[in-house]
Amino acid sequence: MSINKNIARLRRAKSTRAHIRELGVARLSVLRTGQHLYAQVFTADGSKVIAAANTLQADVKDGLKNGKNSDAAAKVGKLIAERAKAAGIEKVAFDRSGYRYHGRIKALADAAREGGLQF
């Protein structure tokens, strides 16, 4: 029985989100595509987006060759940390959406931690 990689990733993400919902803290969610990276901070109940950043935004694109490398992910991480702190959020749960903690996901998380987010 073979399982599609994306279906397996979505199953892992669903399980993680259930655990995060029980914690009752804001959630930093990441979406990775082939060309870009998106990050959003949701409220504890998941009903509202508090802050968002992605590689399509002009302030992230400046000085980058493309939006699909670790440098771009680090810029998104710093920007999401700034925006979350401006909204009054300092502690979040990191929802990596079933992706491995490696490469772009790790770069984003490290930059968000350097920016002052705790998770």
UniProtKB/Swiss-Prot annotation:
Cellular component GO terms, alphabetical: cytosolic large ribosomal subunit
Q: What is this protein called?
A: Large ribosomal subunit protein uL18
| Superkingdom field | Bacteria
Please list the GO terms describing molecular function: 5S rRNA binding; structural constituent of ribosome
Which keywords has UniProt assigned to this entry?
A: Ribonucleoprotein, Ribosomal protein, RNA-binding, rRNA-binding
Q: What does this protein do?
A: This is one of the proteins that bind and probably mediate the attachment of the 5S RNA into the large ribosomal subunit, where it forms part of the central protuberance.
Tell me the protein family, please: Belongs to the universal ribosomal protein uL18 family.
CDD domains reported for this sequence: Ribosomal_L18_L5e
Oligomeric form and interacting partners: Part of the 50S ribosomal subunit; part of the 5S rRNA/L5/L18/L25 subcomplex. Contacts the 5S and 23S rRNAs.
GO BP, one annotated term: translation
